[in-house]
């Protein structure tokens, strides 16, 4: 028997896609959690700005700054970090202090939640990941933001550590490129990378967006209701977006996550909306095979785009497209998966001759996916076909009736894109 697996993938009630996509309630809950973090970050900076304004009026000594900060959310930092925040605010030069007093954090969600490829967790311990960048429009002086790197990071950490202290089970973790707040009972963590962007450039773009009636809230960065076309109003030059780093001598790294978003959206427009579904399915396969440590989401997304960008395929045949991707995926990785970011020479995944044992195991596991999909198509019964599919994607789908006997029909194929290769993205962002 030859089985049609398209409904297994695409059925909105019982198919794989229905087990991966967040419900409206679940999506709203994630936005509410994100908003809690944003509001706390605003509050923390408002408190710190007020203290800086008092210093400007010459009404506070260093000890006075320390005592006043002890009455704010900064009290959730360690004693040493509280003292450091006090010192940094007290010792600011006048220009930096004026910048700081007028500083208003902005927020911009990035990663899979923004790309619409965020899947529900499958195995215990797996979590949904929201990457919500905090952007600081400020004066950039001699290629570095004027306001101190350490102060900004400590204030972002203050917001997360205060939430950790006030919410049972929440846990703060420090990462090189972000602060993370883990919310285990929601199977979620929120990563908060911090960026500095030029104030003058941001204000120019903000004014332009206002005139086009695009801004529906305090800033386009903060709107969760705008569609993707509206988000084009964010046009701060990519080489002016500075990501704060916590480790090593380098404090800032040029990194604009919107380049990743634009690259993926452009790829979906050029190749077809099915790219998002294929990326979801590949991430579902990854999550079923590894609880942690499988191929990264950005590497899977890049490989899928590379394959579908050049290979003829039927965009209405998800089963056939998945089989095509699964067949070519190991070679795509073994060649050395280049980042679409031409400014970064580091590969997303090393070539075969440079792979360590774990990376070789990843590729070997990839090879089994194609075999499983072929075996499922040729299984004796639909129940056997479902069992094979669940080997690949986990026991998410339970309705074997979604799998039907195949009917021969002419197929309309999508030719490979004749457009230029997808434009390069900045790989320094970590995507989930």
Curated annotation (Swiss-Prot):
Induction: Part of a CBASS operon consisting of capV-dncV-cap2-cap3.
Catalysis: reaction(s): GTP + ATP = 3',3'-cGAMP + 2 diphosphate
InterPro entries membership: DncV-like_NTFase (IPR048445), DncV_C (IPR048446), GAMP_synthase (IPR047805)
Cofactor: Mg(2+)
Cross-link Glycyl cysteine dithioester (Gly-Cys) (interchain with C-493 in Cap2), sequence positions: 432
Class in the EC hierarchy, top level: transferase
Modification comment: In bacteria expressing capV-dncV-cap2-cap3, this protein is conjugated to about 130 cellular proteins by Cap2, most of which are involved in metabolism; more conjugated protein is found in the absence of Cap3. Most conjugation occurs via an isopeptide bond with the epsilon-amine of Lys on the target protein, but Cys-conjugation also occurs, including to Cap2. Conjugation or deconjugation from cellular proteins does not change the DncV activity in vitro, but does so in vivo during infection.
Single GO molecular function: metal ion binding
Glycyl lysine isopeptide (Gly-Lys) (interchain with K-? in acceptor proteins) cross-link, renumbered residues: 432
Keyword Nucleus: no
Regulation of this protein's activity per its record: Primed for activation by Cap2 which conjugates it to cellular proteins. cGAMP production is induced in phage T4 infected cells in a manner that requires Cap2 and Cap3, as well as a C-terminal Ala or Gly residue in this protein.
Protein name: Cyclic GMP-AMP synthase
Annotated source species: Escherichia coli (strain TW11681)
Phylogenetic classification of the source organism: Bacteria, Pseudomonadati, Pseudomonadota, Gammaproteobacteria, Enterobacterales
């Amino acid at each position: 028997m030859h089985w049609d697996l398209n409904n297994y993938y695409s059925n909105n009630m019982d198919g794989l896609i229905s087990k991966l996509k967040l419900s409206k309630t679940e999506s709203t809950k994630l936005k509410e959690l994100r908003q809690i973090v944003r509001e706390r970050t605003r509050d923390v900076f408002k408190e710190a700005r007020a203290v800086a304004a008092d210093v400007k009026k010459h009404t506070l000594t260093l000890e006075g700054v320390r005592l006043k900060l002890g009455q704010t959310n900064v009290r959730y930092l360690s004693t040493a970090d509280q003292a450091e925040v006090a010192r940094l605010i007290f010792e600011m030069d006048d220009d930096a202090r004026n910048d700081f007093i007028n500083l208003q954090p902005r927020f911009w969600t990035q990663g899979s939640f923004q790309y619409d490829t965020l899947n529900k967790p499958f195995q215990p311990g797996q979590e949904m990941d929201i990457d919500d960048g905090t952007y600081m429009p400020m004066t950039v002086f001699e290629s570095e933001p004027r306001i101190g790197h350490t102060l900004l990071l400590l204030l972002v950490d203050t917001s997360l550590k205060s939430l950790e202290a006030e919410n049972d089970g929440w846990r703060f973790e420090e990462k090189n490129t972000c602060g993370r707040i883990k919310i285990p009972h929601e199977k979620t963590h929120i990563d908060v990378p911090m960026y500095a962007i030029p104030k003058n450039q941001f204000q120019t773009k903000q004014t332009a967006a206002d005139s086009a009636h695009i801004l529906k809230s305090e800033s386009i960065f903060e709107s969760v209701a705008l569609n993707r076309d509206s988000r084009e109003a964010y046009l701060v030059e990519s080489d002016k977006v500075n990501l704060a780093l916590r480790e090593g001598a380098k404090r800032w790294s040029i990194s604009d996550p919107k380049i990743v978003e634009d690259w993926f959206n452009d790829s979906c427009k050029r190749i077809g909306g099915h790219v998002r579904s294929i990326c979801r399915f590949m991430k579902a396969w990854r999550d079923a095979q590894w609880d942690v440590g499988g191929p990264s989401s950005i590497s899977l997304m890049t490989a899928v785009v590379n394959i579908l960008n050049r290979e003829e395929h039927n965009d209405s045949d998800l089963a056939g497209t998945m089989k095509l991707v699964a067949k070519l995926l190991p070679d795509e990785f073994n060649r050395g998966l280049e980042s679409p970011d031409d400014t970064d020479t580091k590969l997303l995944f090393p070539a075969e001759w440079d792979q360590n044992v774990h990376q070789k195991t990843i590729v070997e596991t990839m090879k089994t996916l194609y075999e499983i999909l072929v075996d499922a198509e040729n299984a004796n019964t639909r129940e056997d076909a479902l069992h094979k599919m669940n080997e690949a994607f986990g026991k998410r789908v339970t309705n074997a009736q979604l799998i039907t006997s195949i009917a021969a029909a002419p197929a309309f194929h999508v030719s490979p894109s004749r457009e230029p290769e997808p434009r390069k993205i900045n790989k320094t962002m970590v995507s989930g």
